Amino acid sequence: MKENIKPKQLDMLHGSIWNKLPLFAFPVAATAILEQLFNASDVAIVGNFTGAGKTIAVAAVGANSFIIALLVNLFVGIALGANVVIANAIGRKDQETVRKAVHTSIVVAVLAGFFISVIGEILADPVLTLVHVPEDVFSEALLYLRIYLLGMPVILLYNFEAAIFRSTGDTKTPLVVLTVAGVLNVLLNLFFVAVLHMTVNGVAIATVVSNAVSSILLLRRLIKTEEWTHVELKELRIDRIIFEQIIKIGLPAGIQSAVFALANVVIQSAINSLGTVVMAASSAAFNIEVFAYDVLNSFSQACTTFVGQNYGAGQIRRCRKVLILCIVEDTLATACAVVLILVFGKQLLSIFNNDPQVVSLGYTRILMVFSAYTFSMLYENMSGYMRGFGISLMPAVLTTLGICGVRVLWIVCVFPRYRTFTGILTAYPVSLCVTAILIFIALFHYKPSKKVQINNI
């Protein structure tokens, strides 16, 4: 295997940082946006090709958005643990740890995917009942969720594989692979729904097939590479020590991401109580606003990976520079994305559903959510910075308090008095503001950059 960094990989340990952060972050953002397009194309196509039942079909897909996010985010966070372990080992030039972490990650992804599929199929019905999916939407929502859950092994495998590539600085390969899968997803959606006249079952099948293709392509690339991340099928096993390191960092990060989604499930339950039109509006808006969030979050991932490698190499001052530059560049990039969406928001909403009431309510949601993005950007980057040092539990705990705690309290205590869509959405800026303050206080007092460098996280 080659010890030197490939030309397509970023050298995070030497040279200027400011110009390398966008080179890492933008492909990550583009990849995340394509992943969102899997679900967005589902919503858009069922909203335009299912005739009189389009509102029910859109609401059925939307009712699952936060449930799916809860599951996927948990294991994407654990995959981030693999990212940090591998990045730290690369910084230390520890090839053996890189090899063990790569093989452990792949096995964990597949086994966890099968576990979620089995448990998810058992709990799908009661979970949809728990979040108060309306009776007229329930059967379609359940059908979509059951099919989607069958694809969890390949969905998780792709996300762990992408984390492996990103830990080396290669963010372009996951983007290229997902571009191919994304185009396939849209074509399959059109074929199943417009040609075969299927409904949510067609778009769910298309999403699973597309994710299978992306995971297989990335696995093939890992098998063929001669770099440290080379995969040897006969070596696929879980290394206990590496697994513990991944879980130590990744599980709190996964809980942090899952808590975000869990809080949104609570909010979705309140939204469901306002009827099908509000559900459809919220679903359409979510599939648009999340594109700006993907830009925002990409710099947080860059912060984690850059800090992880530099921490492994003992370059602590460089770690601090990474945080400052991530906040500055993230602010500029996210602001551009937000402005574009605000300008074209109503036109974008009409792609999903051209009902005037749905468009109006959807745009209201976009405005309310974007009002909180300054707080979101700050807490995401500060959390990413701490994770790069292997500090993952504290951000997870504070996020649970700030996001999940505040939003649940809001829905329980405030929403019953102000039973409106705006009354629900106000929970977003309030909870994100509280979380940003908590993370800042923790960062100021904990001072992770003052930690003494250790051999392993």
Question: What are these model-derived regions, one by one?
Answer:
Residues 55-66, 141, 145, 204, ...:
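Small-residue hotspots at the loop-to-helix junctions and early N-terminal turns
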Residues 14, 18-37, 41, 67-74, ...:
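Residue-level signal for short hydrophobic patches within transmembrane helices
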Residues 43, 55-58, 95, 124, ...:
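Membrane-helix interface/capping residues of multi-pass secondary transporters
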Residues 23-42, 147, 181, 210-214, ...:
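Transmembrane helical elements of multi-pass membrane transporters/channels
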